[in-house]
Amino acid sequence: MGCCLSKKPSPSLPSSVKPSDPIKPMEPVIEPLEEEAKPKSEKLNQEEEEEEVVVIKHTRSHEERSKKTESDKDSPVSSPVAAEKSNSTPLVRISSCTKEEVDAILIQCGKLSRSNSAAKTRRYSGSKRSFDFDQNERIRGGDAAEEDGMQRNRHRGVERVHGSPRERRRRTPSRERERSGSRERGNVGGGGGGSRRVSRSPAKRSEIRNADSCGSSVNSSNNRPGKFVTIPATDKSNNVEPLVKRITVKRNIGDACRIAASPRSKSPARAGNNVPSLSRSNSRKAEQSPYRRNPLGEIDQNTKKMIESVKPNSRTSRGPSPSRVAVVELTKAPQVVLSRSRSLRKSRDFDLVSNEDNNYTALLLKDIQSFHGKSVDDSVISLPLCVSKACSIVEAVADLNSMTNRTCLRSDSSRFRFTSTVKKADLMEPSFEKYVTVKRGGGSLEESSGSNNVT
């Protein structure tokens, strides 16, 4: 406060030096007026501190005010008529001095008490300040119109510079854009809350950007952090059916599909399925998933196809075929010319009887029984029934192989038949002929009927 009051005599000294000699006796008048103004200004300051009135003023407005007060001081000092008026009405002179001093004191108090003012609520601070200043000016009895204009301008500047931190923070261009976007959204919604501030959480931020860019339902589903569905681009023509495309779905385990018109329900994987049920059980999730398969239906189709493909094979294998009989006849006929073994005699009997019975298994059994009956008489040792069955199986396999290899039927199959029949003869008639070896270097044949023909 002392430094503020020390500044005041500095402009008054050159003003007192400038005028002529008859105005010099005004100097002692100004000094007691200033001394009287000091306790009054201190009293006003104490009253304002008791009322806890906080005032924040701009420095430029104070400089303009100080210039105006200096010009006001110069004008009464220069004219003696004004000096006489000031002597006659000392209250006006006191009020002009105390305005400047009170302004300086209030500015300094405002600088000191800015931290306290920041702690208070700032919603109605402007109106309170203007009301307090107007009251102070009315009490002092100064020019009310000029002071009101000055105070309003000063408060506008103060509010512009020393506004709330939220207002200062929201003055950036990006935040201005966001405010305009939020106002437009509020006007479109028609709720009347266009100036309402939207929260800046990440979820809301993504919602704002998606709503501004494109208002598609796929982007709006991203607001839910529990379920993300990414769908590739599809043809927009309704007439053409889209190709089967893969849909990647990432969702929580317990989150069921609650929307009937979701992209998952429109997927091509569900094209042939029925209308989804309205139940909220967990089975509905399995019904609507595009990866769901119907294993029973697939097994039924596969088994039907397998049964249809297996049935003709079993029939052809069991039933008689004239081509097979003809092949047997063709392959067995030249064997009579090649050798005269007992197995060839058996095949000769088989060829003669084949026209009577067409069942292939019956023919095999009949041939085995007839051969077994003859071999008992000729052979020394009789073989069990399992060996005869094995021989019949070997012959059946030979017949099947001959059917598959029709290209080399007359050359290779005849040799194979011959060797198989020789082996069969060896199995059915175990005699000393098996143990007779033939030397290719020119050895003599020793009572061997079939072993010397083996290549």
Swiss-Prot record:
InterPro entries with a match to the protein in the record? At1g65710-like
Q: Which domain of life is it from?
A: Eukaryota
Specify residue ranges for compositional bias: Polar residues. 213-224
Compositionally biased region (Basic and acidic residues): 35-46, 61-75, 129-143, 156-166, 173-186
UniProt-annotated stretches for the region Disordered: 1-234, 258-304
Q: Where is the composition biased (Low complexity)?
A: 1-20, 260-271
What is the name of this protein?
Uncharacterized protein At1g65710
Source organism of this protein record: Arabidopsis thaliana
